[in-house]
Every structure is written in structure tokens, then in C-alpha cells.
């Protein structure tokens, strides 16, 4: 098991996104974020620019997928983990251009709770 004292968790996020206890939030320019990726030992990334940057830097990462698919947007260098099947029908009346709002509208969340989204043991094993 990994322990918090063994590593630092850097959370790349926008200023308007929630922060998490025990992490260092970083909201910086593209170059600074790419530098963080380049210097990092391990990476847990969502389907976003981070996994593209990691692939370009030849940094294998764990990438979590919910709305998009690694078949289309992923890189074979990564351990791509696809979300579990939905456990509830999401409210998608406000969806525009793609199935889910990239901002994370809670009404569109297709699970009863966050713990159902991914196989957490698979994610942990991927980071070992």
C-alpha cells in the first residue's frame, strides 16, 4: 500500500475546481504543467491534455476514462482504465456537442456514487 509520507500529490486543476486535502494544487500555464509531468515519477491522469503531454514525453501513466474512449483519444504507452458501466441513467437534456458536459454537471453523473466509477484496486495496482 502507498502511504502519503512516501510521495507528494500534485493536483493539476483550474482555479474554479475543488481542491483535495493532502494535495498540492497547481493552476499554472501549460509549460509549467508539462514540466511537472516531465519531472514526476508516477501520474494518475484523466482524459485531458495531461495524458497527451505524458505520451509526448514518453512517460507511461495511468489514465482514467469516463466519457471518451482510449481507442480514439488514448495512447498505447499508458495503462488506460475505462470506467465501470453506468449504474444510473444520467440526465442529459442539457448536453451539447458531446454526451457529457466537460464542466462536470452533477445531474449528468451516471453513477449512484463516486465509488462505483472505477475499480479502485485496478487503479491502485496500476500505480505500484
List where the protein language model places each region:
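Donor-binding and catalytic core of enzymes assembling or modifying cell-surface/extracellular glycoconjugates
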Residues: 4-71, 78-81
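Leloir-type glycosyltransferase catalytic cores
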Residues: 77-128
Amino acid at each position: 500500500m502507498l502511504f502519503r509520507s512516501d510521495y507528494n500529490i500534485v493536483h493539476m486543476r483550474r482555479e474554479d475546481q475543488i481542491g483535495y486535502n493532502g494535495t498540492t494544487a497547481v493552476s499554472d500555464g501549460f509549460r509549467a504543467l508539462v514540466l511537472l509531468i516531465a519531472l514526476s515519477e508516477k501520474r494518475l491522469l484523466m482524459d485531458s491534455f495531461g495524458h497527451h503531454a505524458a505520451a509526448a514525453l514518453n512517460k507511461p501513466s495511468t489514465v482514467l476514462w469516463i466519457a471518451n474512449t482510449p481507442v480514439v483519444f488514448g495512447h498505447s504507452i499508458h495503462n488506460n482504465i475505462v470506467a465501470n458501466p453506468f449504474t444510473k441513467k444520467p440526465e442529459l437534456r442539457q448536453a451539447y456537442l458531446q454526451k457529457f458536459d466537460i464542466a462536470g454537471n452533477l445531474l449528468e453523473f451516471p453513477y449512484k456514487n463516486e465509488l462505483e466509477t472505477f475499480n479502485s484496486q485496478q487503479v491502485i495496482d496500476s500505480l505500484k
